From Swiss-Prot:
Protein's recorded name: Cell division topological specificity factor
Summary of the function given for this chain in its UniProt record: Prevents the cell division inhibition by proteins MinC and MinD at internal division sites while permitting inhibition at polar sites. This ensures cell division at the proper site by restricting the formation of a division septum at the midpoint of the long axis of the cell.
Family to which this protein belongs: Belongs to the MinE family.
Signal peptide: none
InterPro entries the UniProt entry points to: MinE (IPR005527), MinE_sf (IPR036707)
Amino acid sequence: MALLDFFLSRKKPTANIAKERLQIIVAERRRGDSEPHYLPDLKRDILAVICKYIQIDPEMLHVQFEQKGDDISVLELNVTLPETEETPK
């Protein structure tokens, strides 16, 4: 009887398979594999505020976003300050 069921069973429609694959892709993206869309603007704004007080090279500012678990996000900010103080321009 199992052999008969094998040949008479219907395959899943391709629409259902595509839907399942899309749900997997969306779930992976929500998991935090990519950085937030606002991160470049945030980095630019932070650099502007720092430059009001001390002149630094934009390459000396590093911003990193990490997703830890479902409800914890970490924003790490590293600024390399020059050894001598310069007045802002």
